[in-house]
Amino acid sequence: MSNIIDVHGLTKRYGDQTVVKGIDFSVEKGEIFGILGPNGAGKTTTLEMLEALRTIDGGTAVIDGIDVAKHPKKIKDIIGIQLQSTNFYDHLTLTEQLKMFASLYGSKVDVAALLAKVQLTEKARNYVEQLSGGQKQRFAIASTLVNSPKVLFLDEPTTGLDPQARRNLWELIKQIREEGVTIVLTTHYMDEAELLCDRLAIMDNGQIITTDSPHNLIQQLLKRGFKKKQVVEQANLEDVFIDLTGKAIRD
């Protein structure tokens, strides 16, 4: 499968400090690619350079054949961005906001279909402040789809959500990928990365340490002799929580 993102020597500096240190990676068309790392590793800065939100101080990033540094406007036309702290307008309904976002791209959007995709049809006339945490995150993703992006960037999309809302969002992310959209996400949750991502890049101190599928990374660790005491259960506490509170969406 061909690459839709190619990154070579990508670098970001703030004064004397280099926070992203000449990293290389590629993302295949149609995959979910995750970037894992501790706070301060450079994950968000890397995404922001790919999104043309921060200047690139060294190296290159190419998305769908377009150089990010040379053509930032063209890049913004083909990507969707869901930030950690997405801000919406308090005085506009969900329907009005999606129409406004679409107008910024000069595109038309079927608002009803988009709200149905994120299971917010009944909230079409509501304001963002009236939504639960999970509903806000789903609406944030809906807002990134108004321009039919080829690549969707999600920065810690399930932070602050309860287990049930997290699983609902996972299903939405997988559905979007099945429709042909490439997804690049950052996360602190190992279970999320293992469930969603086809491949992962693990970052630390501004560098990419390794890139591979979750399965291969685990197998490589085991081959090095890693062992831990493990009790295999058929369910976990998160499963209990969701079973007791209901499997239908209750955000």
Task: Please give the residue ranges for each predicted region.
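Conserved ABC ATPase "signature" region
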Residues: 99, 103, 108-123
